[in-house]
Structure formats: structure tokens, C-alpha cells
Swiss-Prot record:
It comes from the Bacteria. GO terms for biological process: L-histidine biosynthetic process. The gene is hisD. It comes from Xanthomonas euvesicatoria pv. vesicatoria (strain 85-10) (Xanthomonas campestris pv. vesicatoria). Binds 1 zinc ion per subunit. Pathway: Amino-acid biosynthesis; L-histidine biosynthesis; L-histidine from 5-phospho-alpha-D-ribose 1-diphosphate: step 9/9. NAD(+) binds at Y127, Q189, N212. Zn(2+) binds at Q259, H262, D360, H419. Substrate binds at S237, Q259, H262, H327, D360, E414, H419. It catalyses: L-histidinol + 2 NAD(+) + H2O = L-histidine + 2 NADH + 3 H(+). This is Histidinol dehydrogenase. GO terms for molecular function: histidinol dehydrogenase activity; NAD binding; zinc ion binding. Keywords: Amino-acid biosynthesis, Histidine biosynthesis, Metal-binding, NAD, Oxidoreductase, Zinc.
Length: 431
């Protein structure tokens, strides 16, 4: 990792230091995804079969996961893994349940009541990738809040393996969250199928889940077309660590590597006011890299990552808020005392014994988070992501008589005569 001294950088160099790996979508990718989507819309399941054979190397007659498939998955998953997933589900459920909104009502004027009621989104589509490795934890992170929200139907797509099966752990994770409608579909074609529907796959109102550049582009295209809403902008995984001189170098290095191993386009940043800590973390990175099975991937990510020396921790928080990381680790002696300075981050991890990996799997928070600076305006997935908040209002005759004049004045100011007339008729006055 390159080491920079923030105080020695001019404005342009500071911007460059916080620039994420270039995430431009090639015209070729955009066009390829558009063609896949158009093919699925036009030919449905027939297109899905051809695309799946081409990209996944397997011919499927049926995309739906059967009861026999679920049973086989249960038998294939080790008891300790199943128990770990059950434990994770319990904590994810507890955290997300605590944050659920029940709506509210308020009388804004005599005879005028305004309410907010909560309704589940009817049908949602979950995408669980299985590129370099299957991600059953993502099935848990999406399935639990969907269940708590009360969505009428939950559809899950995950890529098939060469033998036509689906990763057993993903299926068990789906079952543990109550998801039983699972399809052996991956990539942009899965997104198209869930957005527009085919003979086998129902169309969904909103799509959730991470994926590669093709999946991300497909989500953006179906959202732009109005076919389905999506959870949030997606991008490569990232972590920013703010560490003081008392931090454990081995812990900090391990946290940086846990994100770097996601992919060569991941980015990790370390901000510290201690030269000694930065130097020690550099040493630990090399020690721990030698033990990783995905060391080559991690090295590629580290090559475009930074360690930044700051003069004071206040400066580190200003930099972090500017960057708006997906994951923010505060490896500080009094981490909670600094929490008030955090303005933009997807998820925050306090202290030496809260690695980001806990949030990825089993602390209870959600690991589907905004990336690429989107944390300035977006939040991670929650139960509310699977719900609609519907406004309701009711006015009595006395209520409209009391506030109607306000509406009349505003309607006239905007030149909307029909608006004014709709109120005036009920009040029995001239518009």
C-alpha cells in the first residue's frame, strides 16, 4: 500500500488519494447487457436456457429449485454450518425487528388527521451471487428483512453449478429465512427475468442484492426502464480504518485484508496519526498475505489502496466523511466518543474487537451496504427497504373549513384553478 502524508498533499493530490478504482462501464458491457435483457423479454425461458448454457455451461430444462433439491442441500450442509447460519439468522432478526416502523398518526388541525401506514412490497427479487465463491450470508441478509416486512412473495435467483445444482449452503440459508421460491439463474439474465418475468420466473416489484459488473448494469437498466426498483447503487467492496497509536497492527492489517480479498477492484484505506502504527501495519500485511489463499487478489486491491498519515484524528474523520466508506472501522481507544463525528458511512465498527467480518456474517447488522460514496445519501438494506410508507389523510367538514382557505390561496398562486375549485366546492365558497 502506498503511504501518503495528508499535510504534504495539495488539493488535486488529496482528491486523487481518495479516488476509487475507475468503475467505468464499457460500452461493450452496456450493450451486451441490453441485448441479454431484450432477449429475455422477447423469448422468456427459451432465452434463459440458451444464455445459461452459454455462460454457466449447463443445460437446464427447469430453473426452479425442487423440494428434492432442498432436501439434498440439507443433507449436504455440515451441521456446524447450519447451526452457524441459524445463529446468524436469530441476530439479524433481532436487530432488524428492533428498527421496524409501525407508522403513526397526528392531528395537524382540528378535524384533520394525517397518517403514515406501512405496507410490504408485494413481490421482491433477491439475487445471491456465486462468482468466485457462493455467498449464503447474502441470502440471510436479504431473506430475513424480506420476511419481517411481510412481502407476499419472495423470489431468489442464484447461479447454477456445472452439474445443474445450486450451492447447498445458499439453499439452506434461503430455507432458514422462509424463502422457498428459488431459481437456478445467474448474471444479467437473472435480473432481467425477475424484472420482466418469464414463463417460469415471476416479475418482481423491487430487486435486491450484489453482483458483478453485468449484474450491476442490468439492475441499473431495468430500474431506468421502470420495470423494477432496485435497492441501491452497487460497486466494489471497501473499508476505511481510522486507527490511533494504541491499535493492534495485526488486527488492523487483518481488517484491511478481509476487504482486499473480495476482489482486485476493492479498496482499503488506513488513516492514522501514528507513523509507528502505519509502519507496523505494513509489516503485518506481508506476514498475513503469505497465509491467504486469495493473496494474489488481495495484492491487486492493495496496489490501488492507501495509508494516509494525518496530523490529528479530527482530520481523519473529515477525510472519512468526504470519502463516505461502505465500512468504517474505528480502531481507537475511545471509539464511541468519536462516533458523533461520523457523518457518512454504510456501517461502523467500534473498537479493537469488532472486525468488519462480524458485520458481514453474524453480528446482526446488514452487510448489503452503499458503496462508491453512496453512503452520503443511501443507507444499508433494512426492513424498510422491503416496505412502502403510504400517506393517509382524512378531513371532516369542520376540518376543510378550517384549513381550506390556506389551500385556496396556494392553488391560486400556482394558477391551478381546478385545485382551488375542488376545495371551494366542499367549503361552499367561491373559488
Amino acid at each position: 500500500m502506498k503511504i501518503l502524508d495528508w499535510s504534504q498533499l495539495d488539493g488535486a493530490a488529496r482528491t486523487d488519494a481518495l479516488t476509487r478504482p475507475v468503475q467505468t462501464v464499457a460500452t461493450q458491457t452496456r450493450d451486451a447487457v441490453a441485448a441479454l435483457i431484450a432477449d429475455v423479454r422477447a423469448r422468456g425461458d427459451a432465452a434463459l436456457r440458451e444464455i445459461t448454457a452459454r455462460f454457466d455451461g449447463v443445460s437446464l430444462e427447469s430453473f426452479a429449485v425442487s423440494e428434492a433439491d432442498f432436501a439434498a442441500a440439507e443433507a449436504a450442509v455440515a451441521p456446524e454450518l447450519r447451526q452457524a447460519m441459524q445463529d446468524a439468522v436469530a441476530r439479524i432478526d433481532a436487530f432488524h425487528r428492533a428498527g421496524m416502523s409501525e407508522g403513526y398518526a397526528v392531528e395537524t388541525a382540528p378535524g384533520v388527521v394525517c397518517e403514515k401506514i406501512v405496507r410490504p412490497i408485494g413481490r421482491v427479487g433477491l439475487y445471491v451471487p456465486a462468482g468466485s465463491a457462493p455467498l449464503p450470508s447474502t441470502a440471510l441478509m436479504l431473506g430475513v428483512p424480506a420476511r419481517l416486512a411481510g412481502c407476499r412473495e419472495v423470489v431468489l435467483c442464484t447461479p447454477p453449478r456445472k452439474d445443474g445444482s445450486v450451492d447447498p449452503a445458499v439453499l439452506v440459508a434461503a430455507q432458514l429465512t422462509g424463502v422457498r421460491r428459488v431459481f437456478k439463474l445467474g448474471g444479467a439474465q437473472a435480473i432481467a427475468a425477475m424484472a420482466y418475468g418469464t414463463e417460469s420466473v415471476p416479475s418482481c416489484d423491487k430487486l435486491f442484492g450484489p453482483g458483478n459488473s453485468y449484474v450491476t448494469e442490468a439492475k441499473q437498466q431495468v430500474a431506468q426502464s421502470g420495470a423494477a426498483a432496485i435497492d441501491m447503487p452497487a460497486g466494489p467492496s471497501e473499508v476505511l480504518v481510522i486507527a490511533d497509536a494504541g491499535a493492534q497492527p495485526a488486527f488492523v492489517a487483518a481488517d484491511l485484508l478481509s476487504q482486499a480479498e473480495h476482489g482486485p477492484d476493492s479498496q482499503v484505506l488506513l488513516l492514522s496519526d501514528s507513523d509507528g502504527l502505519i509502519d507496523a501495519v505494513q509489516v503485518q500485511l506481508e506476514v498475513q498475505l503469505a497465509q491467504l489463499s486469495r493473496a494474489d487478489i488481495a495484492r491487486q486491491a492493495l496496489a490501488q489502496s492507501r495509508m494516509i498519515k494525518v496530523q490529528a484524528l479530527d482530520e481523519a474523520f473529515a477525510i472519512s466523511n468526504r470519502y463516505a466508506p461502505e465500512h468504517l472501522i474505528l480502531a481507537l481507544r475511545e471509539p464511541r466518543a468519536w462516533l458523533a463525528q461520523v457523518e457518512a458511512a454504510g456501517s461502523v465498527f467500534l473498537g479493537d474487537y469488532t472486525p468488519e467480518a462480524l458485520g458481514d456474517y453474524c453480528s446482526g447488522t446488514n452487510h448489503v451496504l452503499p458503496t462508491s460514496g453512496a453512503a452520503r445519501a443511501y443507507s444499508g438494506v433494512s426492513v424498510a427497504s422491503f416496505q412502502n410508507m403510504v400517506s393517509v389523510q382524512a378531513a371532516s367538514k369542520a376540518g376543510i373549513d378550517g384549513i381550506g382557505q390556506c389551500a385556496l390561496i396556494l392553488a391560486r398562486a400556482e394558477g391551478l384553478d381546478a385545485h382551488a375549485n375542488a376545495v371551494a366546492l366542499r367549503m361552499g365558497v367561491a373559488a
